[in-house]
């Protein structure tokens, strides 16, 4: 495999999920840290060479750059047991990866960032206005996961896979955004199962 470099901000859950996937497949990552709060991903060099979208994580594969965390996780998991062989189960895995970025991360992860990085006392008018809707959408996402996991051990095909890795990252830290894991017993049990997997690494 070509050399892998993870351009990251280590505290980011999107970066952690790539490190976690790499750990499960035994891929060695070189890590390159950026201070997003200082604008290091908005420099002309970063924008022209690494990601014109000005965001991390970016997985560098040799001389090529792959933005978007779930794309990077899928790349690393390809050819391993983390992606099921069945065609429907593969599509269902993608469903969860898309859902995580569309319905889960924008709410659960955003509130973590707002409360843990910015601080409620520093919220601007937009953040204060958006907070109730973000919180409600995050509650809906966690309930959907809890209902789904009440009937099975893992998200797809009842076996551990890349969908579990991707959803583990921000779900495991949701209390930093004001959510209560105790309200979601099936999610709590699932988090414990994922963390008990061989190869698991903490954030």
List each model region and its residues.
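GST-like fold's C-terminal all-alpha helical module
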Residues: 85-88, 97-196
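Residue-level recognition of oxygen-bearing side chains
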Residues: 71, 186, 199
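Structured helix-beta-strand junction loops
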Residues: 53, 79, 151-152, 197
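GST-like domain detector, emphasizing the conserved glutathione-binding G-site
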Residues: 1-129
